[in-house]
């Protein structure tokens, strides 16, 4: 699961996918 934009999030995730606040 991710946000509208794929960029660096605030979370420990291998793949930066989210709207900034990580929704992985």
Curated annotation (Swiss-Prot):
High-level lineage: Eukaryota, Viridiplantae, Streptophyta, Embryophyta, Tracheophyta
Biological processes, Gene Ontology terms: lignin biosynthetic process; methylation
Protein's name according to its UniProt entry: Probable caffeoyl-CoA O-methyltransferase
Family (UniProt): Belongs to the class I-like SAM-binding methyltransferase superfamily. Cation-dependent O-methyltransferase family. CCoAMT subfamily.
Note on how the cofactor is bound: Binds 1 divalent metal cation per subunit.
Pathway recorded for this protein: Aromatic compound metabolism; phenylpropanoid biosynthesis
Cofactor(s) the protein requires to work: a divalent metal cation
EC number: 2.1.1.104
Organism of derivation: Pinus pinaster (Maritime pine)
One example GO MF annotation: metal ion binding
């Amino acid at each position: 699961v991710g946000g509208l934009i794929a960029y660096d999030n605030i979370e420990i995730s291998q793949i930066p996918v989210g709207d900034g606040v990580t929704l992985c």
